[in-house]
Each structure stands twice: as C-alpha cells, then as structure tokens.
Amino acid sequence: MFYKNRPLSPYVTIYSSQWTSISSIFHRLSGLYLVFFLFVLFCSIKFLFCFSTFWFVYKFVKTCFFFILSFFIVFIVFSMYSLFYHFFIGLRHLVWDEVILMEDNFVTMSTKLSLSLSLVLVLINCLRYFLV
C-alpha cells in the first residue's frame, strides 16, 4: 500500500519538519551556545584581570570601545534568549517526564509558548537594562 504524501524517514530531504523537531535541535544548540558563552565570559574576565595593568591593552580597549561594546551587547542578548529558551524547553521536558500534556496539540502549543515567552522575557530585560 502506497501513501502519496507520507514522509519516508527523518533523514530524507523531503521530510517535513515539525515544531517539536526544530525545537529539539535548537534546544541542543542553545545548550552548546551557553557553554560557549560561559567559556568566553571566563576567558574575558581572566584576560581583563591578567592584562589590566598594561598600558597597551588599556589603549586597545579604549580605541575599540564602541565595537567591543556593540559586540558585547549582541552577545548578551543572544545569551539571554538562549538561556530563557533552554530553561523553558527544560521545563517542558520535566512536564513530559511525568507524562502530562503529551497530546499533539499541547506539544505544539508548548513549543510555541516557550519560543514566545523567551522572546518576551528578552525584550523585558533589554528594556530594563539597556534603555534605563
């Protein structure tokens, strides 16, 4: 029996993606990004403490201040979104461990809800910290 529009496998290029598969991939990527963010944060703190007494480092930071500041702000905003998204998807998985809300419509709704709540929290924090 042949079904015309049925996907064969998730590895086939004609496979139609769902919200849950995309959110699972982005959950893993956000975890990797958070590890990268912590590594860069600790390395930059170490760099500032080790080389803060040298005049050439001070001069370099002073000349590139706006570039460094804009890069840092974008880095912080992406990190906030990644943190909130990873948190909400983790909460969703904790609910799923108790076998609650496992129907298809609730699964899709929880994915969209976690995406939107993450965006709302990032916007609130950006307004709170960057515009005050």
From Swiss-Prot:
Record membrane topology: Multi-pass membrane protein
Provide a GO CC annotation, any one: mitochondrial inner membrane
**Cross-referenced InterPro entries:** SQR/QFR_C/D, Succ_DH_cyt_bsu_CS, Succ_DH_cytb556, SuccDH_FuR_B_TM-su
Give the transmembrane region(s): 32-49, 59-81, 107-127
List the subcellular locations. Answer: Mitochondrion inner membrane
Which terms under GO biological process does the entry name? Answer: mitochondrial electron transport, succinate to ubiquinone; tricarboxylic acid cycle
How are cofactors bound according to the entry's free-text note? Answer: The heme is bound between the two transmembrane subunits.
Question: Could you tell me which pathway this protein works in?
Answer: Carbohydrate metabolism; tricarboxylic acid cycle
Say if the entry is tagged with keyword Heme. yes
Q: Enumerate the SUPFAM superfamilies for this protein.
A: Fumarate reductase respiratory complex transmembrane subunits
Q: Which UniProt keywords apply?
A: Electron transport, Heme, Iron, Membrane, Metal-binding, Mitochondrion, Mitochondrion inner membrane, Transmembrane, Transmembrane helix, Transport, Tricarboxylic acid cycle
Q: Where does heme bind?
A: 86
Q: Tell me the cofactors it needs.
A: heme
The protein's matches in Pfam families, at most eight in alphabetical order, are given as:
Sdh_cyt (PF01127)
One MF term in the entry's GO annotations: electron transfer activity
Whom does it interact with, and what assembly results? Forms part of complex II containing four subunits: a 70 kDa flavoprotein (FP), a 27 kDa iron-sulfur protein (IP), a cytochrome B and a membrane-anchoring protein.
Its function?
Membrane-anchoring subunit of succinate dehydrogenase (SDH) that is involved in complex II of the mitochondrial electron transport chain and is responsible for transferring electrons from succinate to ubiquinone (coenzyme Q).
PANTHER family the record matches: SUCCINATE DEHYDROGENASE CYTOCHROME B560 SUBUNIT (PTHR10978), SUCCINATE DEHYDROGENASE CYTOCHROME B560 SUBUNIT, MITOCHONDRIAL (PTHR10978:SF5)
What family does the entry list?
Belongs to the cytochrome b560 family.
Q: What is this protein called?
A: Succinate dehydrogenase cytochrome b560 subunit
**What lineage does UniProt assign to this protein's organism?**
Eukaryota, Rhodophyta, Bangiophyceae, Cyanidiales, Cyanidiaceae
Protein's gene:
SDH3
